[in-house]
Amino acid sequence: MFSALGKWVRGSRNDKDFVTKYTADLSQITSQIHQLDVALKKSQSILSQWQSNLTFYGIALTVLALSYTYWEYHGYRPYLVVTALLCIGSLILFKWALTKLYAFYNNNRLRKLAKLRAIHQKKLEKLKEETHYNATSSIIQRFSSGEDQNDDAMVLLDDELNAKYQELNNLKTELEKFKKESHVKGLKKEDSDAWFDKIISVLAGGNELDSTSSLSPFKKIICPQCHWKSNCYRLASKPIIFICPHCNHKIDEVKEREDAIEAKQPAQPSQSEKEKTK
């Protein structure tokens, strides 16, 4: 028993050391990568600033050198041309050397960054191997999000979602059947309307639509005058205002409901009747 307890204690300590070691290593590598990224971004702005300063001071020194040459040699043109060429050449040489120096340091930083990223990726791969991440993640993904949905959906879904899944499969089967029948002998309008009614019911979250059932929340809109059946549905508990496109008969259930409420209320006595009672 004591040996088992000792193994358990050593195992827990090893796990803690394992996590601490990888956390420290990955944190250090990530910090170095971040510092190099920041240095690379700053170096470009520093180079631009140095280039602009070098251009400004180089032009200023060139003007001073030409002025001194003009004053010393009394405007002798060959000396002025040589001085200008030397100053401009020196300026170009310094700018080229600065660019090369920046490229040298920048390439070194890029190589360090690539090396650190490779070490970081290698550490992660080693961590995955030691923790069996690839095997466990595939199992977790299968049973949490349902990789094999046809098998796992029947296990994980409750009865209501399972019933909805069966309804959708039935609609899919009926659609394939209707397609075959329409190619052979054509599809009747009544059958297509019934199938679309079922689709509306499933998408609305209810069962099959039945305008004659008192339990259905939906009812098909039918004109009471000419008995024209529309392809529209309404909520049975909500009043509507509808004008039939065939006979122009108007259905105003809002007004009918207000009239019914007023009829149920007791009639208020007039002012003369109140005075007589007094």
Curated annotation (Swiss-Prot):
GO MF term list: zinc ion binding
Signal sequence interval, chain numbering: none
Zn-finger segments (C4-type): 223-247
Spans traversing the lipid bilayer: 46-66, 78-98
Region (Disordered): 258-278
Gene Ontology process terms (BP): endoplasmic reticulum tubular network organization; nuclear pore organization; response to endoplasmic reticulum stress; reticulophagy
Source superkingdom: Eukaryota
Residues on Lumenal side: 67-77
Pfam families in alphabetical order: Zn_ribbon_10 (PF10058)
InterPro entries per UniProt: Lnp, Lunapark_Znf
Coiled-coil parts of chain: 107-183
UniProt keywords, alphabetically: Coiled coil, Endoplasmic reticulum, Membrane, Metal-binding, Transmembrane, Transmembrane helix, Zinc, Zinc-finger
GO CC aspect terms: cytoplasm; endoplasmic reticulum; endoplasmic reticulum membrane; endoplasmic reticulum tubular network
Localization, UniProt: Endoplasmic reticulum membrane
Record topological domains on the Cytoplasmic side: 1-45, 99-278
The protein's role, per its UniProt record: Plays a role in tubular endoplasmic reticulum network formation and maintenance. Works in conjunction with the ER shaping proteins (reticulons RTN1 and RTN2, YOP1), and in antagonism to SEY1 to maintain the network in a dynamic equilibrium. May counterbalance SEY1-directed polygon formation by promoting polygon loss through ring closure.
Record note on quaternary structure: Interacts with RTN1; this interaction is negatively regulated by SEY1. Interacts with SEY1 and YOP1.
Note: Present with 3390 molecules/cell in log phase SD medium.
Family (UniProt): Belongs to the lunapark family.
Protein name in UniProt: Endoplasmic reticulum junction formation protein lunapark
Organism phylogeny: Eukaryota, Fungi, Dikarya, Ascomycota, Saccharomycotina
